[in-house]
């Protein structure tokens, strides 16, 4: 069976076409657009320009899908923080329906965390830990024990809106780094997270994968899709100014994240500090794969 899944996020809009049979999946096609929807949100409303960006991107994706063996009923579109956390959600969803002819499911923060967990557990073997998915406009957290979620929540801060709120230029200054860290710690302290002692992190999403890629560019030893918090902190210290020779590794590996990667790594470091984590296990799969396994593949197995 074939399914197309579109994830409308705060920083990126991603289209992935999968071929699947039960739990066996293969990616047939992938496209990413750096839409930066957070830039179009002011006073909790997405501007008309932002709505046009979403609609145009989705129309482009629908045109691509017409060239692929994908039927209309196998196209699934969901949105996360960029559309979930605004006052004019209904306006955006209606505009997408009228422009692109598709329905968008706006998933809650808890559901996003759960689906990210479902996807990640098909890539990482952990009995207990904390799943962390750092997006552009929010960061999802799911604490799990014995392979069951015991707590999940959504921090209303991601790598892109952290940059928007706290950073003036491209690379955050020491003062701006501290502002991001304090913002994250304040939000974490406000949550009713159970105290379970030190937990490993299962890292999901583009920010964490990009951090791991950057570690490789810097010549750090590849430890089977793992990154120590010590390595993460070393990278944060390394990128402290705007000189080209200092930021060259980011430009080489993840140029489209030049402004959001350091804020994202600071976010990850503060979450790790909160959970006393020493290592991040990098998952290849995340919320889109979780959506596929939970909503589609499971149903095909039951038929």
Stretches with model-predicted labels:
Residues 10-12, 120, 135-141, 206:
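Ser/Thr-glycine-rich phosphate-binding loops at phosphate-binding pockets of nucleotides
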Residues 12, 30, 129, 136-138, ...:
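Broad gene-expression machinery/nucleic-acid interaction feature
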Residues 17, 40-67, 72, 80-92, ...:
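Helical "lid/coupling" subdomains associated with nucleotide-phosphate turnover
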């Amino acid at each position: 069976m074939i399914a197309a899944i579109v994830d409308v996020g705060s920083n990126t809009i991603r289209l992935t076409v999968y071929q699947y049979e039960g739990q066996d999946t293969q990616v047939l096609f992938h496209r990413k657009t750096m839409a930066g929807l957070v830039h179009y949100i002011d006073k909790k409303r997405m501007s008309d320009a932002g709505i046009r960006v979403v609609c145009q991107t989705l129309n482009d994706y629908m045109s691509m899908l017409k060239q692929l063996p994908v039927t209309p009923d196998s196209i699934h579109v969901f949105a996360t923080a960029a559309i979930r956390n605004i006052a004019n959600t209904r306006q955006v969803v209606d505009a997408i329906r009228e422009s692109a002819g598709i329905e968008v499911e706006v998933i809650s923060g808890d559901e996003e965390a759960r689906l990210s967990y479902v996807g990640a557990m098909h890539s990482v073997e952990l009995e207990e830990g904390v799943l962390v998915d750092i997006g552009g406009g929010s960061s999802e957290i799911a604490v799990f024990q014995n392979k069951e979620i015991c707590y999940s929540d959504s921090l209303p801060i991601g790598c892109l809106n952290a940059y928007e709120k706290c950073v003036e230029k491209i690379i955050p200054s020491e003062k701006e780094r501290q502002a991001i860290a304090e913002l994250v710690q304040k939000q974490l302290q406000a949550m009713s997270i159970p105290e379970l002692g030190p937990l490993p992190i299962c890292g999901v999403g583009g920010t964490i994968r990009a951090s791991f890629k950057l570690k490789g560019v810097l010549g750090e030893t590849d430890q089977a899709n793992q990154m120590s918090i010590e390595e993460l902190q070393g990278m944060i210290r390394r990128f402290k100014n705007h000189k080209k020779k200092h930021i060259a590794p980011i430009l080489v590996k993840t140029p489209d994240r030049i402004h959001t990667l350091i804020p994202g790594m600071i976010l990850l470091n503060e979450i790790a500090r909160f959970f006393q984590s020493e290592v991040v296990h990098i998952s290849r799969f995340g919320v889109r794969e979780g959506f596929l396994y939970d909503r589609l593949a499971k149903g095909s197995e039951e038929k």
